[in-house]
């Protein structure tokens, strides 16, 4: 299955169980990588033992010179310090602007590889080879790259489109249950914002997706990518407000991740909690139907994303939200679902947020 991402520099997303085997041959057909003298594969300590040799063998079979960097797995790796180590390693390998970086891993590896590639020598080509469901449906497509600071997630980064995306569904067979549910959270987010058709298809197939049905999984990945590609095509750098819809659930979700400690809850679980909060906020201030709230709750439950039992002080949550990238002049903005397939970005006053955060905390 191939999804074409349109734009000034269009690229393909190839989805299938055998696409990693053909990585080298595919890259020889991509203009940006066809004549690259060297490919650097960036992976992590979870993924490298499983798939690094296969990726390298495919690249070498296509007559690429191949180098590798393996970083520790986990969100803490997505840091300026690790990025600096990668830049130094790139310099040591004498990578030129005609070389390319392949990101073989989940979202952390994809973000880190995209960021370091886009900034080293003012930009070298990056190829995404996501191995997690979350990375396939979210971070590998759209061009956002970045690293975290102590003040918050993804505060330093670039917009850099990949030259190619290789989504090997074979790699999902080794994905832990927690990470599977994490990807399901982003798929659910996309369905709520996209359309009735996507949402009700996902609702009908939620149990099959949760149990990793191969055909349903491939279809869910493709639908999510098509949705995101359409949004990104309208607003590549978040300058027109259209792309803000992709942050549905993330305002509270990022605060949960930050205050609970990165890694305590998966990104998808935190986003799902943010979706529940935003839908209830929408019902209170934007006319969102309670039927939408319930339908979303049911979908998240069926996908293995129950409401979290964790909470934090409303004032602490609000302080983190004010550092959210959507905030302007200290005013927090939420993506609110007006209905399935309809949304708005709304500024919400502090006292309203605190009131609803207090109710959220009491429910735990």
Residue ranges of each PLM-predicted region?
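ATP/NTP phosphate-donor binding region
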Residues: 1-99
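C-terminal charged capping/lid subdomain of soluble metabolic enzymes
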Residues: 6, 185-187, 287-364
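Residue-level signal for inorganic ion chemistry
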Residues: 16, 41, 79, 130, ...
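Glycine-rich beta-strand-to-loop/alpha-helix junction loops that act as flexible
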Residues: 73-74, 104-106, 236, 248-249
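Non-catalytic interfacial helical region
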Residues: 87-104, 113-128
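Short glycine/serine/threonine-rich phosphate/pyrophosphate-binding segments
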Residues: 108-115, 136-137, 254-255
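A glycine/threonine-rich phosphate-anchoring loop and its flanking beta-alpha core
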Residues: 115-208
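Active-site segments that bind and position negatively charged phosphate/pyrophosphate groups
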Residues: 205-315
């Amino acid at each position: 299955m191939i999804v074409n991402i349109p734009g000034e520099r269009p690229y393909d997303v190839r989805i299938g169980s055998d696409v990693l085997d053909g990585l080298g041959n595919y890259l020889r057909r991509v203009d940006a990588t066809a004549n690259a003298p060297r490919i650097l594969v960036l992976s992590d300590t979870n993924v490298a033992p499983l798939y690094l040799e296969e990726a390298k063998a495919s690249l070498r079979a296509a007559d690429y010179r191949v180098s590798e960097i393996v970083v520790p797995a986990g969100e803490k790796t997505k840091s300026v310090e690790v990025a600096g180590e990668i830049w130094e390693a790139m310099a040591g390998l004498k990578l030129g602007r005609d070389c390319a970086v392949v990101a073989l891993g989940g979202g952390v590896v994809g973000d880190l590889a995209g960021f370091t590639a886009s900034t080293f020598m003012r930009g070298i080509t990056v190829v995404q080879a996501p191995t997690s469901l979350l990375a396939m449906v979210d971070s590998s497509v759209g061009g956002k790259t970045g690293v975290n600071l102590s003040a918050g997630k993804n505060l330093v980064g670039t917009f850099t489109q990949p030259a190619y995306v290789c989504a090997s569904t074979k790699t999902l067979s080794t994905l832990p249950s927690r990470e599977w549910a994490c990807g399901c959270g982003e798929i659910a987010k996309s369905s709520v914002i996209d359309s009735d058709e996507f949402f009700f298809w996902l609702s009908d197939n939620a149990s099959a997706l949760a149990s990793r049905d191969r055909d349903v999984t491939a279809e869910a990945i493709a639908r999510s990518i098509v949705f995101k590609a359409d949004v990104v095509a309208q607003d590549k750098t978040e300058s027109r407000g259209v792309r803000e819809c992709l942050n549905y659930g993330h305002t509270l979700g990022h605060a949960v991740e930050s205050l609970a400690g990165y890694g305590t809850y998966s990104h998808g679980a935190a986003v799902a909690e943010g979706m529940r909060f935003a839908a209830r906020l929408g019902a209170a201030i934007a006319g969102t139907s309670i039927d939408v709230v319930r339908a979303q709750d049911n979908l998240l439950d069926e996908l293995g994303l129950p409401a979290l039992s964790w909470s934090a002080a409303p004032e602490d949550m609000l302080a983190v939200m004010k550092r959210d990238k959507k905030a302007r002049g200290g005013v927090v903005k939420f993506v609110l679902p007006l209905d399935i397939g309809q949304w708005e970005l709304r500024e919400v006053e502090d006292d309203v947020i605190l009131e609803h955060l207090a109710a959220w905390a009491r429910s735990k």
